[in-house]
Curated annotation (Swiss-Prot):
Subunit structure: Monomer.
InterPro entries in alphabetical order: Globin-like_sf, Globin/Proto, Hemoglobin_trunc
UniProt keyword annotations, A-Z: Cytoplasm, Heme, Iron, Metal-binding, Transport
UniProt entry tagged with the keyword Iron: yes
The record's free-text note on cofactor binding: Binds 1 heme group per subunit; upon expression in E.coli it purifies predominantly in the Fe(2+)-oxy form, binding O(2) tightly even under anaerobic conditions.
Induction: Constitutively expressed, it is further induced by S-nitrosoglutathione (GSNO) and S-nitroso-N-acetylpenicillamine (SNAP) (at protein level).
Any one GO molecular-function label of the UniProt entry: heme binding
Record gene name: ctb
Gene3D superfamilies in UniProt: Globins (1.10.490.10)
Assigned protein family: Belongs to the truncated hemoglobin family. Group III subfamily.
Protein name: Group 3 truncated hemoglobin ctb
Gene Ontology terms: cellular component: cytoplasm
Superkingdom in the source lineage: Bacteria
Organism in which the protein naturally occurs: Campylobacter jejuni subsp. jejuni serotype O:2 (strain ATCC 700819 / NCTC 11168)
Record function comment: Has been suggested to be involved in cytochrome c peroxidase or P450-like oxygen chemistry or cyanide detoxification. The high oxygen affinity of this protein suggests that it probably does not function as an oxygen transporter.
Length: 127
């Protein structure tokens, strides 16, 4: 059953499905594993942290207090095309978790974030 509303439970499910895809991806997996680690415990912490980020973005709640853009700026350079892969995997995950209306709400936000990060990384960040 797909979620018809965005809530903490649905965001947690999204994080589980999405990051399982990321970890297995031939392009994104190595970048994320190098930055986060390879243990399930390290990934559990990351999923909770990013879940809090999305809860803040989508629900106005959560206790995220990181600097996601800085984290990306600190990564070794990677091809800009990897953002397309990230968005594809994110949309696939949204399709599993949410109905069409909620998927589109979250996807629009994800596309805006990806666009902003790309501008900052590739126009101004030296990637």
């Amino acid at each position: 059953m797909k979620f018809e509303t965005i809530n903490q439970e649905s965001i947690a499910k999204l994080m589980e499905i999405f990051y399982e895809k990321v970890r297995k991806d031939k392009d994104l997996g190595p970048i994320f594993n190098n930055a986060i680690g390879t243990s399930d415990e390290e990934w559990k912490e990351h999923k909770a942290k990013i879940g809090n980020f999305w809860a803040g973005m989508l629900l106005g709640e959560g206790d995220y207090n990181g600097q996601p853009l800085k984290k990306h700026l600190d990564l070794p350079p990677f091809p800009q095309e990897f953002f397309e892969i990230w968005l594809k995997l994110f949309e696939e995950s949204l399709n599993i978790v949410y109905n069409e209306e909620m998927k589109n709400v979250i996807l629009q936000r994800a596309q805006m974030i990806a666009s902003h990060f790309q501008n900052m990384l590739y126009k101004y960040g030296g990637h």
